[in-house]
């Protein structure tokens, strides 16, 4: 998989059958993660029509993750609707995306982990005025999607587990003796060759 694209469903805080068809993972209002109908790998090749269609002209190689929220939301004048994104969903989103990035070896960058609203300005793929996710709980109104995306990416990065580098095996206590002996042997054989 090449990237992860984050959405809101524009529905209630409950996961619907339609949500399952369009996203690989959906987070309900309580922060629970639900699997979609299709696996992320189904989006490796979308020519067969059996894949999660979540982003116009950008589904191939893309994992679609959504928060179930924002039914009735209006961008201008802003109204979050009756089912706004919750803080619980934002935290669950960061954990899920961190796990997926680790599992699929996706680096957290603006080009590889982005919201639907960032696809057009970042990847230059037209998206018909999508603004998910340009607003999060605590914001008075939507903001620049890349700025909001940077906040989400920072949360995702903060949830990623550091890669443990195994310690160098300890050398046996007598290794210094073997090293010294090898140097002496090397010096003696050089003298004998001359």
Predicted regions located by residue number:
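Basic/polar, cationic surfaces and motifs that engage anionic cell-wall
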Residues: 68-194
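Active-site-adjacent loop/helix surface patches within enzyme catalytic domains
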Residues: 1-111
């Amino acid at each position: 998989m090449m990237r992860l694209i984050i959405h809101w469903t524009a529905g209630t805080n409950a996961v619907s059958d339609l949500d399952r068809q369009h996203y690989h993972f959906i987070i309900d209002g309580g922060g629970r993660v639900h699997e979609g109908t299709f696996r992320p790998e189904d989006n490796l090749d979308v020519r067969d029509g059996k894949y999660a269609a979540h982003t116009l002209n950008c589904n191939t190689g893309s994992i679609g993750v959504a928060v179930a929220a924002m039914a009735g939301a209006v961008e201008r004048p802003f109204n979050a609707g009756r089912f706004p994104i919750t803080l619980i969903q934002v935290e669950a989103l960061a954990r899920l995306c961190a796990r997926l990035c680790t599992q699929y070896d996706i680096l957290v960058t603006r080009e590889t982990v982005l919201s639907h609203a960032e696809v057009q300005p970042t990847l230059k793929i037209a998206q018909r005025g999508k603004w998910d996710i340009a607003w999060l709980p605590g914001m008075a109104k939507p903001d620049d999607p890349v700025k909001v995306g940077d906040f989400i990416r920072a949360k995702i990065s903060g949830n990623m587990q550091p890669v443990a580098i195994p310690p160098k095996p300890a050398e046996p206590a007598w290794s210094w003796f073997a090293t010294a002996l090898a140097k002496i042997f090397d010096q003696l054989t050089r003298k004998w060759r001359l």
